[in-house]
């Protein structure tokens, strides 16, 4: 305590110095570094004391946030003559901040023995020793405090990624944080900010509600929700007779604005009737994804819970007239929506449930709430809607229920249940479920397992209704079978006959076929923006969360969506993840609406007739029966949440194969992107998604200005311990790129191109080695492209769509072999399972030469992403891997992707892929008692790797989606390019792929004998990759000030190869979630061009070693720099140079966003900790 008090006094003095205007930039920077060191010591020494003193808040605000805000304002000032220099400084500072929090998280986990799934053990990284030199002075904190500070780090890593326009990476961090402590509302508030920046209104409101309705609500969320609803009330009323999904969502939010703000309640009845009518019409057209329906339901439940907390029913409450009106209208809307969803479920078949179009998840959530609120059955709204119960009876009987279905309830959470952890309105209903396993605990494997589990839940709920409300439903059991019956006459529900274009969702749902939407759960956020997704008049609008939805080129997004439709039927789950169209939809919403109106007039008319007939048959009010309107939330409805890690996707928290992938996407473990310079030992498996960087523009609120987002953790931290074993999600784009159709041909051409690229890359590597800093500075501005790399890579990219698609599809074949040797030894990025099987073998032979050639140059993923609009998204990881492979011999994501994932990091030592040198160094590191960063870049990558390699398959990404996104992730996060991260296995083994059996390819990466890992927690939903794969443009780490442009593919360099490998992005130091989609970072870090200072990873990775080659071969085949000994030399040089030039670099312009700043920081710490262990830093 005395020691920490002393630290605190020193910190106060430093804070005062930093505010002294007389100090120069160098002095302020020095004070900031000292302040960071002091706060870090306090947090590690006495966490409880530090949290009580709000040290974690001061650390963020004074050491990072204030400086970030200042630099952002200067960079946004167009009149500033030094704007480019400021932008470079901002990029470098964000890189350093990301590195700091990544390191802090790693140290906290090591010191307090916290086992986060998103974290790789230090011994396996070869960077830090797991042993602590002095633990006597450390005060053991409460488990809840450990969980809280880890969540704090994850949240701010997400904030930093958001400032860097890496929205997918940011979402992954936020989701991991939410999973770590579900009862804390801050991560949900940050997710809402991300959704808002993407124009996904439904998702925005959903997460604000989630942030409020938890045990520890986030104070700013209530204000944010009020502002959002007030803005909705200011919008004009919809006068169209046929609404699009976007129109519906806007009206739905407006309805809740009236209720929540108690304004103009006289409009509620008319608006409710219109909503019911349009919901009925839209849902019959399958305009909503499962996830959108769940979000709509949860928002209703939030408001109902807000109006009346029926958990305290024993207490007598007196409600005002306004509260009574709001309650009656909202409960009527809720029950009408439930009835409409039941009628839709009757028309659905198993396919719809698998694909994510089915309303059963939302129905299950609705019945959960009714079971907790039995007094609601006495309300008049229930009596008026008794026609819904015969439909429930028919649905339950269609499951052919058995007695064991009622008695043997599973404790494994469904995707919709996993997403609602901590939600107060449903908390009692979820208590019996086992969330301890995180995303991996979600039902995965065969589609039938998840579907059967949901059916069991529904049967149990039906049995409860029969036992407690016999007037509505009765239940009979005979011969082990359960039969549900009812005395209420059933109204016939008919499939709409209209062929008109269904109302398009805001996102790209309209563009997607219903099948596609069902397949993948995608982020509504990105999808909502793509309003221009073009639905053919003949196609039904499918509400899907498009994970790959990007606010970039609409045409590309549309093409991706169309391709996804074609392939989506095959990979419906993955396609749904594409949310790119959603964003475009918003842009083209006017056009779409007009077209939709034309197309949907017929359907609407038919639907209206059907509704009328149904209502006539029913004795209940016709208006209510048919009033269940389905409006499109701009982004939410039309597109499912796209994993933030995916280029355009904002994934919903949980998603599982059983749950229609489009509806739920569980983010894969957060990918801790590290400086690409860090090379992982062959045995170390690092998920590519962790290395991916989201390039999504930070949109309106990249930075939350309100302090509420940074409420003292001491106040926020939950009283109870939180499971720490959940890995960060690894959202990956699930949309299959359209250009993949000629994947094989492309693969062949890519192989040739790769060979050429290898040569070019070798040249580039030499160039890079000569001038590492130049490239890094270039990357910071607009990553310069290595010409040789560009040429070789461009040759493949000449058909950017083809080559990238090929690589994405065949990264396993072409790039994988090249990349495999280097990456496998260090890190194996995941790649499309399909790709892995198709190309791993053919590519391996080329890998050695390719690795050497491609080692340093990194090809940007942006072009790649954009060219195959969603191919990249879907195949992001493989694509990234491909890029990495092409770009960097050392960073061959695709090769490694092709190869099966190696053993978990824990097994790295035993992995045959590990070079003997690395094994030896690892052993030495373990012997060390002090934390030792062998290589700053390596450390970050290691961190990134841990997230990616979180045990388990990617639960959030469909196999293809994961694979695709995995490539993107790898490519994007040049950090991991060398290491084919375990993304392959994740992709191949994604929970979604298993659950839905879609595009499921066994990790056929025979090239690298990597141990198969369990599906990552975040790959639960096949259709919704959660891995941190980012859109190509998103992956680019553009200056935060330029965030608005970074999201546009056009703003990014057109040639993916050039950006990726040409220069190092400013975010080279990006930690776990910072990998830039631009592989440039990886290139710079890994490329030999930085051999002197920043060639940490590539230089040491064997460029020529093939994945099939033993670890020794991979290590030794690579340029001598690939060996640890070789690395030692560069490390010494780099450390000397970095330390000597660190101050000058920072004070001057920080133009080198690459590893320079972060490396220097790490080097300083290294030197402090090494105590003569210089030899132990081989991978520097």
From Swiss-Prot:
GO terms for cellular component: cytoplasm; telomerase holoenzyme complex. Residues 741-778, 1039-1065 have a biased composition (Low complexity). Keywords: Cytoplasm, Nonsense-mediated mRNA decay, Nucleus, Repeat, TPR repeat. Residues 496-636, 692-795, 893-913, 1019-1127, 1148-1180 are annotated as: Disordered. GO terms for biological process: chordate embryonic development; nuclear-transcribed mRNA catabolic process, nonsense-mediated decay. The keyword Secreted does not apply. Disulfide bonds: none annotated. Residues 728-740 have a biased composition (Pro residues). PANTHER family: NONSENSE-MEDIATED MRNA DECAY FACTOR SMG7, SMG-7 SUPPRESSOR WITH MORPHOLOGICAL EFFECT ON GENITALIA PROTEIN 7. One of its GO terms (molecular function) is telomerase RNA binding. TPR repeats lie at residues 151-184, 186-218. It holds the Pfam family EST1_DNA_bind. InterPro entries: DNA/RNA-bd_Est1-type, Est1-like_N, Est1/Ebs1-like, TPR-like_helical_dom_sf. Plays a role in nonsense-mediated mRNA decay. Recruits UPF1 to cytoplasmic mRNA decay bodies. Together with SMG5 is thought to provide a link to the mRNA degradation machinery involving exonucleolytic pathways, and to serve as an adapter for UPF1 to protein phosphatase 2A (PP2A), thereby triggering UPF1 dephosphorylation. Required for normal embryonic development. The keyword Repeat applies. Disruption phenotype: Morpholino knockdown leads to a phenotype ranging in severity from weak to severe that includes an elongated hindbrain, altered midbrain-hindbrain boundary, stacked somites in severe phenotypes and a mortality rate of 97% at 5 days post-fertilization. This is Nonsense-mediated mRNA decay factor SMG7. Residues 504-520, 692-718, 1026-1038, 1103-1125 have a biased composition (Polar residues). Its main location: cytoplasm. Residues 547-559, 584-606, 615-627, 1076-1090 have a biased composition (Basic and acidic residues). It is found in: Cytoplasm; Nucleus. SUPFAM superfamilies: TPR-like.
């Amino acid at each position: 305590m005395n020691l920490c008090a002393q630290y605190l006094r020193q910190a106060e003095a430093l804070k005062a110095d930093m505010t002294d205007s007389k100090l120069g930039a160098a002095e302020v920077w020095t004070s900031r570094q000292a302040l960071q060191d002091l706060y870090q010591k306090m947090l590690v020494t006495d966490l409880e004391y530090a949290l009580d003193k709000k040290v974690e808040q001061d650390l963020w605000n004074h050491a990072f946030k204030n400086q970030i805000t200042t630099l952002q304002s200067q960079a946004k000032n167009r009149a500033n003559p030094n704007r480019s220099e400021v932008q470079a400084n901002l990029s470098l500072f964000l890189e350093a901040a990301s590195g700091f929090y990544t390191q802090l998280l790693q140290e906290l986990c090591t010191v307090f023995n916290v086992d986060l799934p998103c974290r790789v053990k230090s011994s396996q990284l070869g960077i830090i020793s797991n042993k602590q030199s002095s633990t006597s002075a450390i005060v053991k904190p409460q488990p809840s405090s450990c969980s809280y500070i880890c969540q704090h780090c994850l949240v701010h890593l997400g904030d930093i990624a958001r400032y860097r326009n890496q929205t997918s990476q940011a979402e992954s961090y936020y989701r991991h944080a939410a999973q770590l402590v579900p009862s804390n509302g801050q991560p949900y508030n940050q997710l809402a900010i991300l959704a808002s920046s993407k124009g996904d209104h439904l998702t925005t409101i959903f997460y604000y509600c989630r942030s409020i309705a938890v045990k520890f609500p986030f104070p700013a969320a209530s204000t944010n929700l009020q502002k959002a609803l007030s803005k909705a009330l200011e919008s004009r009323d919809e006068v169209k007779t046929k609404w699009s999904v976007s129109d519906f969502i806007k009206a739905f939010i407006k309805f809740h604005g009236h209720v929540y703000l108690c304004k103009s309640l006289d409009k509620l009845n008319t608006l409710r009737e219109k909503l019911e009518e349009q919901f009925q019409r839209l849902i019959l057209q399958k305009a909503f994804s499962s996830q959108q329906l769940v979000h709509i339901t949860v928002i209703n439940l939030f408001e109902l819970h807000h109006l009346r907390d029926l958990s305290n029913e024993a207490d007598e409450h007196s409600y005002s007239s306004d509260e009574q009106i709001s309650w009656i209208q909202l409960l009527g809307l809720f029950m009408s929506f439930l009835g409409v969803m039941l009628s839709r479920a009757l028309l659905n078949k198993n396919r719809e449930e698998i694909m994510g179009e089915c309303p059963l998840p939302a129905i299950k959530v609705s019945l959960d709430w009714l079971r907790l609120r039995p007094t609601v059955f006495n309300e008049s709204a229930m009596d008026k809607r008794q026609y819904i119960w015969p439909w429930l009876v028919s649905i339950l009987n269609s499951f052919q229920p058995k007695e064991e279905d009622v008695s043997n309830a599973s404790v494994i959470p469904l995707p919709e249940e996993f997403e609602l952890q901590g939600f107060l309105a449903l908390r009692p209903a979820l208590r019996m479920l086992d969330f301890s396993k995180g995303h991996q605990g979600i039902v995965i494997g065969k589609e039938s397992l998840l579907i059967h589990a949901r059916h069991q839940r529904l049967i149990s709920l039906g049995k409860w209704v029969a036992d407690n409300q016999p007037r509505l439903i009765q239940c009979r059991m005979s011969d082990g079978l359960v039969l549900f019956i009812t005395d209420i006459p059933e109204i016939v529900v008919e499939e709409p006959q209209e062929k008109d274009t269904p109302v398009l969702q805001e996102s790209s749902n309209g563009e997607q076929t219903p099948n596609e939407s069902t397949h993948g759960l995608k982020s509504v956020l990105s999808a909502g923006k793509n309003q221009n997704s073009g639905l053919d008049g003949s196609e039904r609008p499918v509400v899907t969360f498009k994970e790959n939805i990007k606010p970039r080129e609409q045409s590309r997004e549309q093409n991706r969506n169309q391709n996804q439709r074609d392939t989506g039927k095959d990979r419906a789950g993955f396609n749904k993840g594409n949310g790119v169209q959603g964003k475009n939809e918003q842009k083209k919403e006017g056009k779409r609406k007009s077209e939709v109106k034309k197309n949907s007039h017929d359907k609407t008319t038919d639907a209206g007739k059907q509704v009328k007939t149904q209502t006539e048959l029913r004795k209940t009010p016709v208006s209510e029966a048919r009033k269940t309107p389905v409006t499109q939330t701009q982004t939410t409805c039309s597109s499912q949440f796209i994993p933030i890690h995916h280029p355009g996707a904002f994934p919903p928290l949980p998603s599982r194969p059983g749950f229609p992938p489009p509806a739920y996407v569980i983010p894969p473990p957060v990918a801790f992107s590290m400086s690409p310079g860090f090379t992982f030992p062959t045995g170390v498996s690092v998920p590519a998604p962790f290395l991916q960087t989201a390039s999504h523009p930070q949109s309106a609120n990249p930075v939350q200005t309100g302090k509420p987002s940074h409420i003292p953790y001491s106040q926020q931290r939950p009283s109870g311990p939180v499971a720490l074993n959940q890995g960060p999600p690894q959202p990956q784009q699930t949309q299959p790129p359209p250009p993949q159709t000629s994947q094989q041909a492309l693969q062949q051409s890519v192989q040739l191109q790769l060979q050429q690229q290898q040569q070019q890359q070798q040249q580039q590597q030499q160039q890079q080695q000569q001038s590492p800093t130049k490239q890094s500075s270039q990357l910071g501005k607009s990553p310069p492209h290595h010409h040789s790399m560009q040429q070789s890579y461009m040759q493949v990219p000449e058909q950017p769509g083809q080559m990238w698609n090929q690589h994405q599809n065949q990264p396993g074949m072409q790039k994988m072999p090249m990349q495999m040797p280097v990456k496998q030894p260090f890190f194996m990025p995941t790649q499309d399972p399909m790709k892995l099987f198709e190309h791993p073998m053919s590519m391996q032979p080329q890998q050695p030469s390719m690795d050497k050639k491609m080692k340093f140059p990194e090809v940007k993923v942006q072009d790649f992403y954009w060219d195959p609009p969603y191919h990249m998204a879907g195949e992001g990881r493989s694509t990234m891997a491909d890029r990495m492979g092409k770009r960097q011999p050392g960073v061959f994501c695709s090769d490694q992707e092709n190869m099966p994932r190696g053993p978990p990091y824990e097994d790295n030592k035993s992995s045959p892929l590990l070079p003997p040198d690395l094994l030896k160094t690892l052993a030495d590191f373990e012997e060390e008692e002090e934390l030792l960063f062998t290589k700053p870049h390596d450390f970050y990558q290691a961190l990134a790797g841990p997230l990616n390699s979180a045990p388990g398959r990617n639960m959030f990404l469909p196999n293809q989606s994961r694979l695709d996104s995995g490539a993107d992730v790898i490519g994007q996060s040049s950090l991991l390019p060398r290491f084919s991260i375990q993304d392959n296995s994740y992709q191949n083994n994604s929970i979604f792929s298993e659950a839905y059996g879609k595009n499921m390819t066994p990790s056929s990466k025979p090239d690298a004998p990597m141990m198969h890992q369990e599906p990552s927690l975040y790959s639960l939903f096949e259709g919704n990759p959660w891995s941190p794969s980012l859109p190509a443009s998103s992956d680019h780490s553009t200056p935060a000030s330029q965030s608005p442009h970074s999201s546009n593919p056009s703003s990014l360099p057109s040639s993916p190869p050039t950006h990726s490998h040409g220069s190092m992005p400013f975010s080279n130091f990006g930690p776990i979630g910072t990998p830039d989609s631009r592989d440039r970072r990886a290139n710079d870090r890994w490329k030999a061009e930085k051999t002197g200072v920043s060639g940490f990873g590539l230089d040491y990775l064997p460029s020529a070693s093939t994945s099939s080659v033993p670890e020794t071969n991979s290590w030794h085949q690579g340029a001598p720099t690939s060996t640890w000994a070789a690395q030692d030399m560069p490390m010494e040089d780099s450390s000397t140079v970095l330390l000597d030039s660190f101050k000058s670099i920072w004070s001057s312009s920080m133009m080198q966003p690459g590893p320079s700043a972060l490396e220097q920081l790490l080097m300083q710490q290294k030197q402090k900790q090494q105590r003569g262990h210089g030899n132990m830093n081989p991978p520097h």
